[in-house]
From Swiss-Prot:
Domain C1q: 162-318
Natural source organism: Danio rerio (Zebrafish)
Stated role: Insulin-sensitizing adipocyte-secreted protein (adipokine) that regulates glucose metabolism in liver and adipose tissue.
UniProt-listed GO biological process terms: regulation of D-glucose import
GO MF term set: hormone activity
Name the record gives this protein: Adipolin
Keywords: Disulfide bond, Glycoprotein, Hormone, Secreted, Signal
Biased composition range(s): Pro residues: 94-112
Pfam families xrefs: C1q
Superkingdom, taxonomy of origin: Eukaryota
Amino acid sequence: MRCWVLAVVTAVLWSQCIPLGWAEGRKVPKRLKEGAPQHTEAFNTTLSNSEELDGSPKQVGENQRVDPLGSWMDFVKRPVGNFPGKCRKRKRPLPGPPGPPGPPGPQGPPGAPGAEVTQEVLLREFKEMIKEATERRAAVDRPSEPSQLPTALITLEGMTSYRRIEEAFHCKLKGPVVVDKKTLAELQNFQTPPAKGAFLRGTGMDQSTGRFTAPVTGIYQFSANVHIDHTEVKRSKSQLRARDNVRVLICIESLCHRYTSLEMIVGLESNSKIFTVSVHGLLELQAGQYTSIFVDNAAGASITIQNGSDFMGMLLGV
């Protein structure tokens, strides 16, 4: 009787366990399939020695929760550079066109005031412009072959060197002047010849007295050509001595020994009837001082200064 009761209970229990086992068998694979992509383990899960030695995969229980911190640590500690091939071969997108320009910035502070432009600076720049323009024009107009009449190119600097001479003269003696023996005579009575070429500029030259008075202090150039007739000396040739000579001087204030003078000494041994004594040089005159020509006859007979003897002078500079 007992055996029959046990057999009935066993059969009932067996009939109830078969459907439950079949359902569990269908559930477990689906759960494993869903959990395959996210295989994580609890941060505080401890494995036994037998589980560590066994290489079988771990099975997560149904009631075991996933640790977020452990999952994050696994993500952080993943190997770098192990990306799929598709990500590595993907081309970066090209940059787009540049955007519109931004608005202008604020105005900066005012600069320092410029240099003061004076009249001298403007004049110097104007001279440089004229010089450059003249050089360019000369380079363009220069002929390939030399011509007989070259074009005169006068620059602004060159014009300053050809300034007008305010004081200058060229006059000649009107008539003959006799100078006695052992006599120092001053030549006077000059005139400006009517022929072209002679000139008289300024008011410094007094032709009646033969004296030129300096209007300003400066350097002056003087020249004199004195034509001498020594016929009387030749007639008395027996009396001619070695010390007989004629001196022509251009003196300052008629003081030939006190001031520097221009001097020329000539002997009387010439065979010609008339000879010329020329003297020229530079003198510095103060304003108001005058110069004139003196003839010193040291011979034993008189001599005659011929008309046409000339006296020239000009102001070189202050």
